Curated annotation (Swiss-Prot):
Its cofactor is Mg(2+). Binds a second Mg(2+) ion via substrate during catalysis. The lineage of its organism: Bacteria, Pseudomonadati, Bacteroidota, Cytophagia, Cytophagales. It comes from Cytophaga hutchinsonii (strain ATCC 33406 / DSM 1761 / CIP 103989 / NBRC 15051 / NCIMB 9469 / D465). Mg(2+) binds at residues 242, 288, 315. Catalyzes the reversible conversion of 2-phosphoglycerate (2-PG) into phosphoenolpyruvate (PEP). It is essential for the degradation of carbohydrates via glycolysis. This is Enolase. The active site is at residues 205, 340. One of its GO terms (biological process) is glycolytic process.
């Protein structure tokens, strides 16, 4: 038998120096599964609840001792003695134990920490790498990286409204080659920025955070970096955005306000047309959160305009939630889901969201959060679920590189069985 003998939660720090929760699940054979939970800066209002203490005298209210206590005092006693391989059953038990629609009682961070640590402990018991334990024999797809090389929006203190300007080395023949291309472009971007007298300080996700005048100027700068590295924009390397539009959408006036850059205010229709114009003029392959999370009519218009040309990713729109994803599918909105394990709060529900997307020909993009740790679980999950794409930051900061390095190891381990989709990432 492989039973759970002990579950221990503790408070550690994320990449922003804020507290987060880490959980160990220990089996009767002494094997340990350990998982640390990430945290977002721009969070969708439909996400599961990240439980924090809100005691302003400690860590400015950001401590997670309540979540830690919920694991140690409430969840652990219920699970000790359970079979470590009962992932679905245990996840459902924790969800029922919480009893709320958004995991607001125990905290999604508490439940997720246990859920991921459980899977890692089970993989140890099975003598398998995590990607193989979760994904089975068909887990062999290495994801095309979406590398965030310019940070803006809530992730940087600069004059760029859009949160992430990313490159996708779709012309690469392997994940290893894609990383080389991304690294070369990242370092050439530093040279381009320096030549313009701009800062090469980095934001939360490792991308540069220069004080560029506008969103389009940032896009042009990325293209210059691609060319400086010796690659062809639109052939070897494509461009992707995370606009995080909910961050600059005014729900009262129903206008998109580029308050950090030009000051322009756009209606939903104008915003959709803005994106269509950029897609027409630049080698853009993917737009994440191009409209506000509750602007369903705006999303419908955007999908109508460019949905057959580019990948339209719902992050705040879908929040890794099968109910919201099904709503989007029913309305023909977007064509891709961003997958963030802490948005929904359990491995079982994350897998369900990816499976629903696949059944309806929506792509899936595995993703980090801006507040990360050295935990590299999402790298294994990207392969396990054959997502085909991953978003885990730039080519700097060890909290980001930990995921990329794990994917390099997985590709090496898979050998000839490894599949890198490249330009076929949406198929």
């Amino acid at each position: 038998m492989s039973l759970i003998e002990e579950i221990v939660a503790r408070q550690i720090f994320d990449s922003r120096g804020n507290p987060t929760i880490e959980v160990d699940v220990i089996t009767e054979n002494g094997l340990i599964g350990r998982a640390a939970v990430p945290s977002g800066a721009s969070t969708g209002k439909h996400e599961a609840v990240e439980l924090r203490d809100n005691d302003k005298s400690i860590y400015m209210g950001k401590s997670v001792l309540k979540a830690v206590a919920n694991v140690n005092d409430i969840i652990a006693p219920e699970l000790i003695g359970s079979h470590v391989f009962e992932q679905n059953l245990i996840d459902r038990l924790m969800i029922d134990l919480d009893g709320t629609a958004n995991k607001g009682k125990l905290g999604a961070n508490a439940i997720l920490g246990v859920s991921l640590a459980l899977a890692k402990a089970a993989a140890q018991e099975a003598g398998l790498p995590l990607y193989r334990y979760v994904g089975g024999v068909s887990a062999n797809t290495l994801p095309v990286p979406m590398m965030n090389i310019i940070n803006g929006g809530s992730h940087a203190d600069n004059s760029i409204d859009f949160q992430e300007f990313m490159i996708m080395p779709t012309g690469a023949k392997s994940f290893t080659e894609a990383m080389r291309m991304g690294s070369e472009i990242f370092h050439n971007l530093a040279k381009v920025l320096k030549s313009k007298g701009m800062s090469t300080n980095v934001g939360d996700e490792g991308g540069f955070a220069p004080n560029i005048a506008s969103n389009e100027d940032a896009l042009i700068t990325v293209i210059q970096a691609i060319e400086a590295a010796g690659y062809r924009p639109g052939e070897d390397v494509m461009i992707a955005f995370d606009a995080a539009s909910s961050e600059f959408y005014d729900s009262e006036t129903k206008l998109y306000h580029f308050k950090k850059s030009t000051g322009d205010k756009l209606t939903s229709s104008q915003m959709a047309s803005y994106w269509a114009d950029l897609v027409k003029r630049y080698p853009i392959v993917s737009i994440e959160d191009g409209m506000d999370e509750d602007d369903w009519s705006g999303w419908a218009e955007l999908t109508k305009l460019v949905g057959d040309k580019v990948q339209l990713v719902g992050d705040d729109l879908f929040v890794t939630n099968v109910s919201r994803l099904q709503q989007g599918i029913d309305q023909g909105i977007a064509n891709s889901i961003l997958v963030k394990v802490n948005q929904i709060g359990s491995l079982t529900e994350t897998i369900s969201a990816v499976n629903l997307a696949k059944r309806n020909s929506y792509t899936s993009v595995m993703s980090h959060r801006s507040g990360e740790t050295e935990d590299n679980t999402i790298a294994d999950l990207a392969v396990a679920l054959n997502c085909g794409q991953i978003k885990t930051g730039s080519c700097s900061r060890s909290d980001r590189m930990a995921k990329y390095n794990q994917l390099l190891r997985i590709e090496e381990e898979l050998g000839e069985a490894a599949y890198f989709p490249g330009k076929n990432m949406r198929k």
